[in-house]
């Protein structure tokens, strides 16, 4: 599995808000290295038929290699396509290791939650997960751009958390069948929707009115956070600022499509088409 040489090869890891040709050329290598680190960890946590314990063991070994690379030591020979590139980026750009470690923590949490049949009790618990599964990506990118302002970091967190939540609502029908439940359980109880009903709705392609109201409540709460975070586009100059405009508008467009489908996310999964990209581009121009 060769490592990507530029951000143009980034196509899989949905939590990674980075595009292709808009990425500043001098940052493509470190961004690709960070991406490949996250992508490989995601695969360890999610792909194949390994047991939960084997996945956790693999991520523990992966973390050990990260710590070795952060100290200038040789990593194991298991993932040379990851750590040979990442080690260079760590030294050259002084990457904050805690953000990379947070991503691994989130992957481990996903494995344990799925293994134990657990969901998220409250919105606060779900958002805490997002602080490790999504927000580190934005903070790493800001670090590469040399932006450390607290307000900018807060805006970045809002964008990344919003993107993660949008991905959850978009992928409900897929995640539920994989034993992953991201709608907070207290919200489910409030709307009178059980986990068994969610599973049955996906399997039968029939969604109750209460389930629709539940999903609508989640999706309609997300845009405000994204719009607040979008102030970041005015703090980042050049290509990176334009790239971020497309990222923000892409997330908001998915929310538009969720609404257009009457929040029937247990039946449908919205996807962007050519016209959507035209709309995204137009909206990005006017941010």
Model-based region annotation:
Residues 1-163, 169, 173-287:
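Catalytic cores of Mg2+-dependent Asp-rich isoprenoid enzymes
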């Amino acid at each position: 599995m060769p490592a990507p040489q530029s951000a143009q090869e980034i196509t899989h890891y949905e939590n990674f808000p980075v595009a292709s040709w808009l990425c500043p050329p001098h940052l493509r290598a470190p961004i690709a290295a960070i991406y490949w680190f996250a992508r490989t960890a995601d695969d360890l946590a999610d792909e194949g038929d390994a047991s939960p314990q084997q996945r956790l063991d693999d991520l523990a070994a992966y973390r050990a290699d990260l710590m070795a690379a952060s100290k200038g030591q040789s990593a194991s020979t298991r993932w040379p396509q990851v750590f040979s590139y990442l080690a260079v980026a760590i030294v050259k750009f002084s990457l904050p290791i805690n953000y990379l470690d947070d991503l691994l923590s989130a992957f481990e949490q996903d494995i344990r939650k799925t293994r134990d049949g657990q969901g998220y009790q409250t919105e606060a618990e779900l958002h805490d997960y997002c602080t490790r599964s999504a927000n580190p990506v934005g903070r790493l990118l800001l670090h590469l751009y040399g932006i450390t302002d607290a307000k900018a970091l807060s805006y970045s967190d809002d964008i990344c958390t919003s993107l993660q939540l949008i991905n959850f609502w978009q992928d409900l029908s897929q995640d539920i069948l994989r034993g992953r439940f991201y709608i907070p359980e207290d919200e489910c109880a409030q709307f009178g929707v059980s986990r068994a009903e969610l599973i049955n709705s996906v399997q039968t392609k029939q969604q109750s009115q209460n389930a629709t109201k539940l999903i609508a409540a989640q999706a309609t709460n997300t845009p405000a956070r994204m719009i607040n975070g979008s102030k970041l586009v005015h703090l980042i100059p050049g290509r990176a600022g334009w790239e971020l405009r497309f990222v923000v508008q892409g997330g908001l467009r998915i929310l538009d499509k969720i609404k257009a489908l009457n929040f029937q996310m247990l039946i449908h999964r919205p996807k962007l088409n050519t016209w959507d990209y035209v709309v995204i581009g137009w909206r990005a121009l006017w941010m």
